[in-house]
């Protein structure tokens, strides 16, 4: 199956962008317009990079497409590529990030509480979530800041590194998790789920056979 790189361009677009892989060194990077539900840019890549995303976005802008917003998975530096464009971090991917640090079954009370809080992302507002995250921090600050001393070197490190990473990820990304709420008139999606569904369709349609056959 051949992959077209460009499609008919709308005047305005809310971009959802991500890359899926069909094998080692064969990925498909897609920029989709959530307003029309159409892909605007599709290209084969070996690895996704911020430079490739920037190139694809700039190509659309050069064709006159007004990028009203963009939604992505939170790849480091990607949200900051175009500060003039409202950028939404996929809430589903944020929850996945927290689960990588805490697992889906944390052992500590603080971890369990933070995991349950992360699961409320899709249901609440920025103010409510921010207040709840601050309340969690105030309740568990002592535990979060516990340090373990290495008896041989005398140096110390945070005891609960994974918990700290999960908390700091939520705190650091807070401004990007509710962009859709700050721009209600644009109809920005809060996840990349619409594009994820298209990726599933691509895989069912046999794009992966291209990689298997070496085409």
Predicted regions mapped to residue ranges:
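RNase H-like nuclease fold core
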Residues: 1-76, 80-84, 173, 194
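Intrinsically disordered, low-complexity regions enriched in Ser/Pro/Gly/Gln/His and often acidic
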Residues: 19, 108, 128-130
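A short hydrophobic/aromatic micro-motif that marks alpha-helical segments and, especially, helix-coil
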Residues: 33, 48, 108, 210-211
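Acidic/histidine-rich catalytic cores and adjacent linkers
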Residues: 65-76, 82, 116-215
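Conserved beta-strand -> loop -> alpha-helix junction used to position metal-binding or nucleic-acid-contacting
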Residues: 69-118
């Amino acid at each position: 199956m051949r992959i077209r790189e460009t499609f008919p361009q709308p005047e305005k677009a809310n971009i959802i962008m991500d890359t899926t892989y069909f094998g080692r060194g064969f990925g498909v990077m897609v920029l989709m317009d959530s307003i029309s539900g159409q892909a605007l840019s599709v290209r084969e890549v070996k690895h996704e990079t911020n430079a490739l995303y920037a190139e694809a976005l700039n190509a659309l802008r050069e064709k006159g497409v007004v990028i009203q917003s963009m939604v992505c998975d939170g790849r480091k530096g990607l949200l900051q590529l175009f500060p003039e464009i409202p950028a939404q971090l996929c809430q589903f991917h944020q929850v996945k990030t927290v689960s990588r640090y805490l697992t889906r079954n944390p052992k500590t009370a603080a971890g369990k509480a933070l995991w349950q809080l992360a699961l409320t992302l899709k249901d609440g507002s920025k103010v409510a979530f921010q207040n709840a995250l601050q309340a969690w921090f105030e309740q568990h600050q002592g535990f979060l800041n516990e340090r373990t001393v290495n008896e041989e070197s005398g140096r110390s490190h945070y005891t609960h590194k994974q918990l700290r990473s999960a908390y700091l990820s939520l705190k650091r990304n807070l401004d990007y998790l509710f962009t859709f709420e700050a721009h209600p008139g644009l109809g920005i999606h809060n996840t990349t789920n619409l594009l994820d569904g298209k990726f599933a369709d691509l895989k069912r349609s046999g794009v992966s056979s291209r990689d298997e056959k070496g085409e």
